[in-house]
A protein has these predicted regions:
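Mid-to-C-terminal secondary-structure elements
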Residues: 49-63, 74-176
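Short acidic/polar micro-motifs at solvent-exposed secondary-structure junctions
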Residues: 1-3, 7-12, 21-49, 64-75, ...
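A generic structural-conservation signal
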Residues: 19-20, 60
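Generic non-transmembrane alpha-helical segments
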Residues: 9-16, 172-176
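Glycine-centered tight turns that cap/initiate beta-strands
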Residues: 12-18, 91, 152
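A structural micro-motif
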Residues: 16-17, 41, 104
Length: 176
């Protein structure tokens, strides 16, 4: 399990620009809006640095506030694909989705930043950056246990300061 100290130590590496910890569940059959079920979606439990580290920007509504990570606020950000598929042309902001029987209020819509071009050098990198689901839902990582009733392993993404630093950033982070 990653701790705040782990993240601090990773971010202090000279090769690292930022890092994020997250959990993920692919194809949950527990995501609804009204009577519409979303098949083949992916749910992410993210920390406050996820969007910046991975290259997302909020295009509608707002992103997570600090309190969303500490107060167990049941809020969600969805990607544009899910917004279009599940809400059928309506704005999702302010709507309530059901994840595993728990109501989450959608506060924003995210898209990949067009300036963000990851370097993909492994199969894991490909799956991290190339999403083929019918949509993504992001919830604060502290809400993961509310939705799935148990902890799952966290993943870590490290954003290097430049391409020359990628190998060392990854190796040094893995050693921590």
């Amino acid at each position: 399990m990653f701790t705040p100290d782990t993240k601090k130590r990773i971010n202090e590496l000279k090769e690292v620009e930022s890092s994020t910890f997250y959990r993920t569940r692919n194809n949950p059959d527990n995501l609804f809006y009204l009577n519409n079920k979303m098949d083949s979606s992916t749910i992410y439990g993210v920390d406050k640095d996820y969007f910046d580290t991975v290259g997302y920007e909020i295009v509608e509504g707002k992103g997570f506030a600090e309190r969303n990570f500490t107060k167990f606020d049941k809020v969600a950000v969805v990607d544009k694909t899910l917004a279009e598929g599940l809400f059928q042309g309506e704005s999702p902001v302010g709507k309530v989705i059901d994840i595993s029987g728990e109501p989450f209020t959608v506060i924003g819509v995210a898209v990949k930043n067009s300036n963000f071009e990851p370097v993909i050098s492994s199969v894991e990198d490909y799956y991290t950056y190339n999403q083929t689901s019918s949509g993504l839902v992001f919830i604060p990582t502290n809400d993961w246990g509310i939705v799935f009733r148990y902890d799952e392993p966290e993943n870590c993404i490290v954003k290097a300061v430049d391409t020359d630093s990628m190998t060392n950033a990854g190796k040094k982070s893995a050693d921590i």
